[in-house]
């Protein structure tokens, strides 16, 4: 092999030139691979950005739904019997059971034959359970003060002090009896059923808005507990 001057070149110089060219080619290939890897990393970052934005958007929507749900929860007012519910939250079977339960009532006049007692028990105390009634940290069923004053307190014995607590028998949906206490908390301001209520909730799996309790007439037994010392729970779920 000859150079530009026409003189032959040594094999050593030729080998060095070939080695240099190969080294340059290898470096160029390595540089190109690094560029491709960098582009892939950028693509991954770009691709993950929409996912991150979607995730953040979902989190914001979830927080908005939680805030909306909290706003829609019923406020605690004096009449604990009041609760706003959405009829679409219930299945057709549950709605049918609720309707049947409300309609299946005996005529109190046929039972008592007394106008005054009939007036007091024309409708028993009924309550749709609220979240505070089934929360594990509450351990009580809140009752309507107005209804308790009209339909329960007048029928207590003189020896029965609701402030200290009155023993009551509570009937479950299956007819089983559990002993609890009816009390007036905060002096005589807040009527509650306690001392065993949460166990009752757990035993029958009672849920807010889906289950009801009643004191007074138990239509299935064709009987009325006129002293307010017995309570029955009707599970509609």
UniProtKB/Swiss-Prot annotation:
Signal peptide: none annotated. Residues 64-73 have a biased composition (Basic and acidic residues). Residues 53-79 are annotated as: Disordered. GO terms for cellular component: nucleus. Keywords: DNA-binding, Nucleus, Transcription, Transcription regulation. SMART domains: B3. Residues 126-230 bind DNA. GO terms for molecular function: DNA binding. It is found in: Nucleus. This is B3 domain-containing protein At1g20600. The lineage of its organism: Eukaryota, Viridiplantae, Streptophyta, Embryophyta, Tracheophyta.
